[in-house]
């Protein structure tokens, strides 16, 4: 037992779970098993800490995690705990994009959460350091911490350095993975040749780390800092940077200290912490996937967060970070000018951050920021609030007759406040890609892709392949794309996703026909189909049959809830 320094406090058991496998006659067999992996008589009083990693060598996003897990283990040992490492899955969105594999991406978030819960409960671990690098593994780990309500610290793998390419014309430029998707569209439109396409392919991923812009992985790493679930400053250093090893060691130490103080994940994951995270996402112009993931993490933490909270905060918080996919800079540049603490500090100075929330350091956000003293925005990568990129946040929730339960737009990329045009309707993404390849997409159209929602997809695929192809073909500012699916954090152009209710649930999007006029008003948060509701509902509807009748996607389609609730299961 650990006696709190507070004389009025109760004793805190730093082995709240693992005592059942280390103490007493009944634990003879489990102790024998644990001796075989290195534990001994001197270790039975130590808390057992899981080191949960989504390491694999399928994708560069996760390559650093084995190294970081070693640092976390050393930190746990140094603080008086005993680390026990295990792995879970991770799906690469970059590899699974544009084909059947993308159905499994969002599903992997739930599998990760369930698998971490399974191991921690089965092995009676007391706390956990959570390590992740690819898009869905970050929220999956945070959801697990919230569900289990154990002492937990999250550490990000870090992002990749940008690549550099010189094209045949002599132009040299910085590139990220998103440039390759757009280059495919440009090649199909005859705007570049295969030689330049190959040059871009070879340049986009120069080493280890997650995709470098303010795409989903970097957005969720920033969210983890803002929630207080990661050590401040740990989101922005590049994957190969040895500061990450220091953060890994400190994360291992921190989780043991949280146990000693009796602080668990839900002590940190309060409503105020989620409001801080939303403010940071809005200021960064982060990925629309953050809406889904924050709703899901809040659900696991039993925090009453709703989709409407995003507009309440986004309408007050300006967009100040000039980051890709719409801006000029990447996460390495954020690190160069002081990291996410600079953004949190700026928000706190303007009254947009709750400074009294607790963090994994055991101290408040305000105390941590004061100690780090991160400085002010540089004015280029991160603007001041006196000269923001946009006066409101980078994400907007829209509602109207097309999406009564909501839709999500990344307004950081919208040059057009109002867009109105005739619908071109496609059941699923492939049909839209075929129409684009055939040159059948017309300027001024509203492309509607449906039956791609959480249940109808199933899996709510990201539409990066089609949006990048639209931009690459030169139509990026001339058409609007709407879907009950979702978009990659790297998506650019006029795109609105997460339309709810989805088509398979007989939402209005299911009844839209070619030629129906659709109007989107970003300023008024409106999204409407200009057809009388009775007329719309009277239309004959023949939904496509279920895509999967067995396996994980069949199970998922029966359990998953609306995107407006975070696509939770």
Swiss-Prot record:
NCBIfam families tied to this protein: ilvD (TIGR00110), PRK00911.1 (NF002068)
Binding site for [2Fe-2S] cluster: 61, 134, 211
Residues annotated as catalytic: 488
Residue list for modification N6-carboxylysine: 136
Gene Ontology biological process terms from the UniProt entry: isoleucine biosynthetic process; L-valine biosynthetic process
Complex and partners: Homodimer.
Cofactor: [2Fe-2S] cluster; Mg(2+)
Name of the encoding gene: ilvD
Family in the record: Belongs to the IlvD/Edd family.
Entry function: Functions in the biosynthesis of branched-chain amino acids. Catalyzes the dehydration of (2R,3R)-2,3-dihydroxy-3-methylpentanoate (2,3-dihydroxy-3-methylvalerate) into 2-oxo-3-methylpentanoate (2-oxo-3-methylvalerate) and of (2R)-2,3-dihydroxy-3-methylbutanoate (2,3-dihydroxyisovalerate) into 2-oxo-3-methylbutanoate (2-oxoisovalerate), the penultimate precursor to L-isoleucine and L-valine, respectively.
Listed pathway(s): Amino-acid biosynthesis; L-isoleucine biosynthesis; L-isoleucine from 2-oxobutanoate: step 3/4; Amino-acid biosynthesis; L-valine biosynthesis; L-valine from pyruvate: step 3/4
Keywords (A to Z) from UniProt: 2Fe-2S, Amino-acid biosynthesis, Branched-chain amino acid biosynthesis, Iron, Iron-sulfur, Lyase, Magnesium, Metal-binding
Co-factor remark: Binds 1 [2Fe-2S] cluster per subunit. This cluster acts as a Lewis acid cofactor.
Positions that bind Mg(2+): 93, 135-136, 462
Entries under InterPro entries matching the protein: DHAD_IlvD/Edd (IPR050165), Dihydro-acid_dehy_C (IPR042096), DihydroxyA_deHydtase (IPR004404), DiOHA_6PGluconate_deHydtase_CS (IPR020558), ILV_EDD_C (IPR056740), ILV_EDD_N (IPR000581), IlvD/EDD_N (IPR037237)
Catalytic activity line of the entry: (2R)-2,3-dihydroxy-3-methylbutanoate = 3-methyl-2-oxobutanoate + H2O; (2R,3R)-2,3-dihydroxy-3-methylpentanoate = (S)-3-methyl-2-oxopentanoate + H2O
EC number: 4.2.1.9
Protein name listed in UniProt: Dihydroxy-acid dehydratase
Magnesium found in the keyword field: yes
Record Gene3D superfamilies: IlvD/EDD C-terminal domain-like
UniProt GO molecular function: 2 iron, 2 sulfur cluster binding; dihydroxy-acid dehydratase activity; magnesium ion binding
Pfam families associated with the record: ILV_EDD_C (PF24877), ILVD_EDD_N (PF00920)
């Amino acid at each position: 037992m650990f006696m709190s320094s507070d004389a009025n406090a109760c004793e805190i058991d730093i082995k709240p779970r693992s005592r059942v496998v280390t103490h007493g006659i009944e634990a003879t067999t489990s102790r024998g098993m644990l001796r075989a992996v290195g534990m001994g008589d001197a270790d039975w009083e130590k808390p057992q800490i899981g080191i949960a990693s989504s390491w694999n060598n399928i994708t560069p996003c996760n390559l650093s995690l084995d190294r970081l897990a070693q640092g976390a283990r050393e930190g746990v040992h140094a603080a008086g705990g005993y680390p026990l490492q295990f792995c879970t899955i991770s799906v690469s969105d970059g590899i699974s994009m544009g084909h059947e594999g993308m159905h499994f991406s969002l599903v992997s978030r739930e599998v990760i959460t369930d698998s971490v819960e399974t191991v921690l409960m089965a092995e009676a671990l007391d706390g956990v350091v959570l390590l992740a690098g690819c898009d869905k593994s970050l929220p999956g780990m945070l959801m697990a911490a919230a569900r289990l309500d154990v002492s937990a610290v999250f550490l990000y793998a870090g992002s990749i350095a940008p690549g550099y390419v010189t094209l045949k014309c002599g132009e040299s430029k910085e590139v990220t993975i998103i440039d390759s998707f757009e280059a495919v569209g440009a090649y199909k439109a005859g705007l570049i040749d295969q030689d330049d396409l190959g040059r871009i392919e070879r340049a986009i991923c120069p080493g280890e780390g997650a995709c470098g812009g303010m795409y989903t992985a970097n957005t969720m790493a920033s969210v983890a800092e803002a929630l207080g679930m990661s050590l401040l400053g740990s989101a922005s250093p590049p994957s190969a940077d040895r500061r990450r090893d220091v953060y890994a060691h400190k994360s291992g130490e921190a989780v043991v200290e949280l146990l000693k103080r009796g602080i668990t994940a839900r002590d940190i994951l309060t409503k105020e912490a989620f409001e801080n995270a939303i403010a940071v996402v809005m200021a960064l112009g982060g990925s629309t996937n953050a809406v889904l993931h924050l709703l899901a993490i809040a659900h696991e933490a039993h925090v009453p967060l709703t989709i409407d909270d995003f507009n309440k905060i986004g309408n007050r918080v300006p967009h100040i970070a000039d980051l890709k996919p719409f801006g000029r800079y990447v996460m390495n540049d954020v690190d160069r000018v002081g990291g996410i603490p600079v953004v949190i500090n700026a928000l706190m100075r303007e009254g947009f951050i709750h400074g009294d929330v607790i963090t994994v350091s055991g101290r408040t956000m305000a105390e941590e920021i004061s100690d780090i003293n991160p400085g002010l925005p540089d004015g280029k990568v991160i603007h001041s609030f006196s000269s923001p990129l946009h006066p409101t946040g980078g994400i907007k929730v829209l509602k109207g007759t097309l999406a009564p339960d909501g839709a999500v737009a990344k307004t950081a990329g919208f040059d057009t406040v109002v867009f109105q045009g005739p619908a071109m309707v496609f059941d699923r993404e492939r049909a839209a890609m075929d129409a684009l390849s055939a040159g059948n997409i017309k300027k001024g159209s509203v492309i509607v892709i449906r039956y791609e929602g959480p249940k109808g997809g199933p899996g709510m695929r990201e539409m990066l392949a089609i949006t990048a192809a639209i931009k690459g073909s030169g139509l990026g500012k001339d058409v609007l794309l709407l879907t009950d699916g979702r978009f990659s954090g790297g998506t650019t152009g006029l795109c609105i996703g997460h339309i709810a209710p989805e088509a398979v649930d007989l939402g209005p999007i299911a009844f839209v026909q070619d030629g129906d006029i659709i109007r989107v008003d970003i300023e008024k948060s409106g999204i409407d189909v200009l057809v009388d509701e009775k007329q719309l509902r009277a239309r004959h509807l023949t939904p496509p049959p279920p895509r999967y009748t067995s396996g994980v996607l069949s199970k998922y389609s029966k359990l998953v809830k609306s995107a407006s609730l975070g696509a939770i299961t």
